[in-house]
């Protein structure tokens, strides 16, 4: 009987401890679930995944056909996280983000960027890649009047959090060797830095046009999640040039007196 009472006492103590003592899970990781179902493995892969935390944690992976899954699962520390997924950066990608070499177009880069708070046992987010480049197509009504075009600006890529980064950007196009009717430049998402179009005419004169002013007057929004493409028409006249900026739905005509 004494042995039986002793066992009951021990059992009661275990129940009491199990109910009153809570496990401290502060040191346990948070499980991050990234829903990748919206990604296009055919046209957009491979994908570069970067996860960075406030306390120095880093996780990097390349997702391609061989290792791609609809849901990516990563154990992360319980703190603030910056999560990045890149597509289309190619050889321009490095540990600091994406850098566009001088003289090159921006690559067709798509970026998912999220700030997440991993403060529980798990956290989920849907990865949706956003278009971070603008195709600027320039048509010249009198191609014989122009030798070359150069687009230049002050954004030369993206930092590791996917924000436009400062640097010298310049792309040159020899009009005589391009397929008419248009020449296309690929521009990265912009910040407040100006953008210029240098036009070298057949007589050797170089004329510079403030593209940033024209694009702003047109109402173009560089902060949109997915950037629109633009079309520009240059029509040289005896007294100047008429610049027409067009998108799918809008048109702006600017007369510049030279």
What are these regions (language model features)?
Residues 19-258:
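Extracytoplasmic cysteine-anchoring/structural motifs
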């Amino acid at each position: 009987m004494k042995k039986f009472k002793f066992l009951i006492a021990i059992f009661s103590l275990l129940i009491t401890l199990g109910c009153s003592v809570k496990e401290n899970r502060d040191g346990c990781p948070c499980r991050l679930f990234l829903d990748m179902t919206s990604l296009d493995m055919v046209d957009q892969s491979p994908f570069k995944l970067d996860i960075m935390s406030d306390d120095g944690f880093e996780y990097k992976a390349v997702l391609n056909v061989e290792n791609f899954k609809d849901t990516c699962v990563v154990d992360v520390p319980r703190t603030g996280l910056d999560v990045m997924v890149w597509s289309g950066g190619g050889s321009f990608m490095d540990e600091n983000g994406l850098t566009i070499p001088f003289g090159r177009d921006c690559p067709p880069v798509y970026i998912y960027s999220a700030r997440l708070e991993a403060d529980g046992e798990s956290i989920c987010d849907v990865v949706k890649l956003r278009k971070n480049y603008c195709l600027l197509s320039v048509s010249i009504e009198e191609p014989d009047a122009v030798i070359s075009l150069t687009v230049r600006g002050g954004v030369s890529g993206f930092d590791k959090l996917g924000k436009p980064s400062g640097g010298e950007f310049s792309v040159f196009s020899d009009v005589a060797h391009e397929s008419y009717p248009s020449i296309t430049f690929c521009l990265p998402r912009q910040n407040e830095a100006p953008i210029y179009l240098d036009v070298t005419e057949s007589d050797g004169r170089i004329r510079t046009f403030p593209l940033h002013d024209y694009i702003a007057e047109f109402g173009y929004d560089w902060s949109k999640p997915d950037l629109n493409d633009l079309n520009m028409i240059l029509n040289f006249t005896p007294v100047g040039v008429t610049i027409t900026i067009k998108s799918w739905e809008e048109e702006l005509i600017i007369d510049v007196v030279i």
